[in-house]
Amino acid sequence: MINTRKTHPLMKIVNNAFIDLPAPSNISSWWNFGSLLGICLILQILTGLFLAMHYTADTATAFSSVTHICRDVNYGWIIRYMHANGASMFFICLFMHVGRGLYYGSYTFLETWNIGVILLFATMATAFMGYVLPWGQMSFWGATVITNLLSAIPYIGTNLVEWIWGGFSVDKATLTRFFAFHFILPFIIAALAMVHLLFLHETGSNNPTGISSDADKIPFHPYYTIKDILGALLLILVLMLLVLFSPDLLGDPDNYTPANPLNTPPHIKPEWYFLFAYAILRSIPNKLGGVLALVLSILILILMPLLHTSKQRSMMFRPISQCLFWILAADLLTLTWIGGQPVEHPYIIIGQLASIMYFLLILVLMPAASTIENNLLKW
């Protein structure tokens, strides 16, 4: 009997990607985050679609329409909070996924890695524009502050900002276009994710040792399908605990006040998942310098393959690099904390030290540690 799974033009693609895919036998739970990100994206598209059915992208009614969703639409409150907290879960999975890539040297798959960095940028842009849509105080002022950063670009900056705003301030035109982009970008992200997967399957997955696993492969189904289902259940459990018990834990109370251009909130800050970059931005007392540091804090990921000086791919057998990796993780947590604090002593100096440490670790200390480890092993 001819196996339809292996011969049908469409089924064949699914089969080669999720069923008969040869996978390393030793990949750990850190390899679960790819599938979890896919689940997050599908969840965000579905909840977002239902929210868009009731939302109005107009400055006069946007805030009221979100209130209407929560009060009057059947299960509107759960859809709204699943979407808001789903974004937080999305970024937790993203950071874990990128961290895994850094730790195990997955960035040596150049095409996969570079598309991943583009995906990270696209997701951050989508999340930023989504945060503007409820049109609360933090939505409005967040949009004003972040878009204003582009005015630091020499010569064209001011014109560029006014072009993005569609006027001389964040107003109706800005909200409408942000809604349009926020709606379309997740589909672009989905397409890019498929390309990401396509390039990954050209090389096959990396594994914790960083050594070729060609000699020991197992089929993706049933082994990793069941493992991914466990991961998905845990993801949904954590998400629903957030949604049902403390839906506003990660939000800002200021966003329950309708946007008012005449009243600036005392502390303007983005959502928690941007705080590390926001802290780096604020730690440089120069507009253009801060913006460059902000962009480079993410763009530095593209340089990772060039900064890899070790003769080994993974950090599994490199204790000095492991130590520096976890210092980097702690540094990012410190930056996240500082990004949410007011600009005053001692937070300013802590933020500046943490920012210097961030770039120093990635650009100097980790490559140096790799070279030391090579010499210790007489390689």
UniProtKB/Swiss-Prot annotation:
Co-factor requirement: heme b
A single cellular component GO annotation: respiratory chain complex III
SUPFAM superfamilies in UniProt: a domain/subunit of cytochrome bc1 complex (Ubiquinol-cytochrome c reductase) (SSF81648), Transmembrane di-heme cytochromes (SSF81342)
InterPro entries: Cyt_b/b6_C, Cyt_b/b6_C_sf, Cyt_b/b6_N, Cytb/b6-like_sf, Cytochrome_b, Cytochrome_b_C_euk/bac, Cytochrome_b_N_euk/bac, Di-haem_cyt_TM
Residues the entry annotates as binding heme b b566: 97, 196
Cofactor binding mode and count: Binds 2 heme b groups non-covalently.
Binding site for heme b b562: 83, 182
Membrane topology, as annotated: Multi-pass membrane protein
Positions annotated to bind a ubiquinone: 201
A family per Pfam: Cytochrome_B
Role: Component of the ubiquinol-cytochrome c reductase complex (complex III or cytochrome b-c1 complex) that is part of the mitochondrial respiratory chain. The b-c1 complex mediates electron transfer from ubiquinol to cytochrome c. Contributes to the generation of a proton gradient across the mitochondrial membrane that is then used for ATP synthesis.
Protein name per the record: Cytochrome b
Phylogenetic placement of the source organism: Eukaryota, Metazoa, Chordata, Craniata, Vertebrata
